[in-house]
Design a protein with these regions (language model features):
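Adenine nucleotide-associated cytosolic modules
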Residues: 1-300
Length: 300
């Protein structure tokens, strides 16, 4: 148990309520990261907490001003990773409406403040599509994302989600950046219900080529190359040593163990980080494999 995190949920809920109250008092406007707005949110949080104590309802011993500050400062920001997470939650709740599963009957707060960079960073807006992301993580992180070279194996359901995420967050979208995608399969009618980048008119077309074209439409700055070759021992002439050596990390979005273990073996050999993930019905798994720090996929 993380004793330092006790009452963290209550602190988050109180901070969220303070932001909502701020909006109510300021014409539906979210607070900015100005000292004036943050101080106002902290004052509101303390008032709400005092009211909770008086009514013997939800309250905390002492309001955590830092939690309120962070919640207020980033309340205006919207980034693709958070949108995807909450989109998944909403989708699951819609499935639960059938009565087969138990719905969420309480507030759900997703706390990822620990992902914020330590120390001062340049968060000045650039007037670009990535401003919200820059406001949270800083310009240096955004520049690194833009220069990344990555290789994604598979352009099905997971692959479609990753292509969208890469395009929206600017991964491989800067000078020198590159996203390479391969899938030797073509789009079928049965794919359309879960591989959301594809439409009826795409049936029969290459998954990787189509996904990359649509990713480019989402963000014209996306530097993307599509391949149609299977990643296997007989295609080492396509995915050769210089190809693997040039990568910063690899993404598995395949649907079989054989392909996963082969890509895992390549990543072990060339010492490349691997993002492994998969889905099964309403369930999913993900695994980040870091050379010399974690087990490889085949060993886990």
């Amino acid at each position: 148990m993380k004793f330092m995190g006790m009452q963290r949920s209550e602190q988050l809920h109180l901070a969220f309520r303070a932001v909502l109250k701020f909006r109510e008092l300021n014409g539906s406007q979210f607070p900015s990261d100005s000292a004036e707005h943050i101080d106002e949110c902290i004052r509101i949080a303390n008032t709400l907490n005092d009211e909770g104590k008086a009514a013997e309802q939800l309250n905390v011993e002492q309001v955590d001003a830092e939690v309120v500050r962070l919640t207020a400062a980033y309340s205006r920001c919207s980034i693709t990773s958070m949108a995807a997470f909450f989109g998944g939650i909403v989708a699951q709740e819609i499935v639960k409406f059938t009565g087969k599963y138990s719905p969420i009957k309480q507030m759900l707060h997703y706390d990822v403040f620990e992902s914020l960079p330590e120390g001062p960073v340049n968060r000045a807006p650039r007037g670009c599509r990535y401003d919200d992301q820059i406001r949270i993580y800083g310009q240096e992180v955004q520049d690194k994302l833009g220069k990344i070279h990555t290789f994604m194996v598979g352009a099905g359901a997971l692959g479609c989600e990753y292509i969208k995420a890469f395009a929206m967050m600017g991964l491989g979208c800067g000078e020198g950046g590159l996203v390479q995608v391969t899938d030797n399969d073509n789009i079928e009618v049965s794919n359309l219900n879960r591989q959301f980048l594809f439409r009826k008119n795409n049936v029969g077309s290459s998954k990787s080529l189509t996904a990359c074209q649509i990713g480019k439409q989402m963000n014209p700055g996306l530097n993307v190359v599509a391949h149609t070759s299977l990643v296997a021992p007989n295609t080492v002439n396509v995915f050769n040593d210089p190809f693997w050596e040039d990568l910063d990390f690899v993404v598995n979005a395949v649907d079989n163990i054989k392909a996963r273990t082969y890509v895992d073996g390549r990543c072990v050999w060339f010492e490349k980080p691997l993002l492994e993930s998969g889905t099964l019905g309403t369930k999913a798994n993900s695994q980040m494999i870091i050379p010399h720090k974690t087990q490889c996929y085949s060993d886990s």
